[in-house]
Amino acid sequence: MPELPEVETSRRGIEPHLVGATILHAHIRNGRLRWPVSDEIYRLSDTPVLSVQRRAKYLLLELPDGWIIIHLGMSGSLRILSEALPAEKHDHVDLVMSNGKILRYTDPRRFGAWLWTKELEGHNVLAHLGPEPLSDEFNGEYLQQKCAKKKTAIKPWLMDNKLVVGVGNIYASESLFAAGIHPDRLASSLSTEECDLLARVIKAVLLRSIEQGGTTLKDFLQSDGKPGYFAQELQVYGRKGEPCRVCGTPIVATKHAQRATFYCRHCQK
């Protein structure tokens, strides 16, 4: 599933081609996504795009009368086309722009979403989200306060959007490795120093992935059709049985809440 770096990479890739241009029309080939494509999107015509923003894993296209909320789901990606290339099987939505560009949404598993809202504040998919991990609000003090009485393992807690948004399976595993923290540790067992370190490495790992265009493991592509290159720098995720890049101990893979977790028994305590 695309996580924060992949969504931010998509935002940065599409923004220059959309902001200041006008949506001439939307071409919806298959509106049966996780939720049906909103009727207002079908009716878009001569609508300028004012900004392209991100909240958590949602892309937000600001229009004069409302917002398009896009979620990439498990396998979605957005590409900017310079010409109307023939659509393939999983190309479900096109926004045809006045500058000759086309924003094409591809989603093999159709778990993504294209929603419309007049107001962002209070929308049900955004209302209960925690802070952005790259914001000043997310720091060691905040993390310690939220972990102090939490009797659950730290890995699934990091992936809870009520704690912090956008830290999915890949980046939770990578951040815990970078901080030297075992994923099965109770959140409440983390010290002040560990919370401070973990908050800092989460920011560092996410920023590094954004610099590399995100992580492509299967479906994700950047807006120019290229893969993200952070996969080449993964320390533990997807490396079951391979030697730890730090100590040489084989990487272990376990399941937490039906999600794969990767870690090093020697480096993470």
From Swiss-Prot:
SUPFAM superfamilies assigned: Glucocorticoid receptor-like (DNA-binding domain), N-terminal domain of MutM-like DNA repair proteins, S13-like H2TH domain
**Enzyme Commission number, as recorded:** 3.2.2.23, 4.2.99.18
This enzyme catalyses: Hydrolysis of DNA containing ring-opened 7-methylguanine residues, releasing 2,6-diamino-4-hydroxy-5-(N-methyl)formamidopyrimidine; 2'-deoxyribonucleotide-(2'-deoxyribose 5'-phosphate)-2'-deoxyribonucleotide-DNA = a 3'-end 2'-deoxyribonucleotide-(2,3-dehydro-2,3-deoxyribose 5'-phosphate)-DNA + a 5'-end 5'-phospho-2'-deoxyribonucleoside-DNA + H(+)
Query: Which positions are annotated as binding DNA?
Result: H90, R109, K150
Known PROSITE patterns for this protein?
A: FPG_CAT, ZF_FPG_1, ZF_FPG_2
Q: So which cofactors does this thing need?
A: Zn(2+)
Q: Which GO molecular function terms does the record list?
A: 8-oxo-7,8-dihydroguanine DNA N-glycosylase activity; class I DNA-(apurinic or apyrimidinic site) endonuclease activity; damaged DNA binding; zinc ion binding
GO biological process entries: base-excision repair
Record-linked InterPro entries: DNA_glyclase/AP_lyase_DNA-bd (IPR015886), DNA_glyclase_Znf_dom_DNA_BS (IPR015887), Formamido-pyr_DNA_Glyclase (IPR020629), FPG_cat (IPR012319), MutM-like_N-ter (IPR035937), Ribosomal_uS13-like_H2TH (IPR010979), Znf_DNA_glyclase/AP_lyase (IPR000214), Znf_FPG/IleRS (IPR010663)
Zinc finger (FPG-type) positions are 235-269
Q: Which Pfam families match?
A: Fapy_DNA_glyco (PF01149), H2TH (PF06831), zf-FPG_IleRS (PF06827)
Q: Which SMART domains match?
A: Fapy_DNA_glyco, H2TH
Q: Which UniProt keywords apply?
A: DNA damage, DNA repair, DNA-binding, Glycosidase, Hydrolase, Lyase, Metal-binding, Multifunctional enzyme, Zinc, Zinc-finger
Catalytic site positions: P2, E3, K57, R259
Cofactor binding mode and count: Binds 1 zinc ion per subunit.
Q: Which family does it belong to?
A: Belongs to the FPG family.
* HAMAP family the record matches: Fapy_DNA_glycosyl
Quaternary data:
Monomer.
Q: Which NCBIfam families match?
A: fpg, PRK01103.1
Q: What does this protein do?
A: Involved in base excision repair of DNA damaged by oxidation or by mutagenic agents. Acts as a DNA glycosylase that recognizes and removes damaged bases. Has a preference for oxidized purines, such as 7,8-dihydro-8-oxoguanine (8-oxoG). Has AP (apurinic/apyrimidinic) lyase activity and introduces nicks in the DNA strand. Cleaves the DNA backbone by beta-delta elimination to generate a single-strand break at the site of the removed base with both 3'- and 5'-phosphates.
**Name listed for the protein in its UniProt record:** Formamidopyrimidine-DNA glycosylase
Q: Which organism is it from?
A: Salmonella schwarzengrund (strain CVM19633)
What gene does the UniProt entry assign to this protein? Answer: mutM
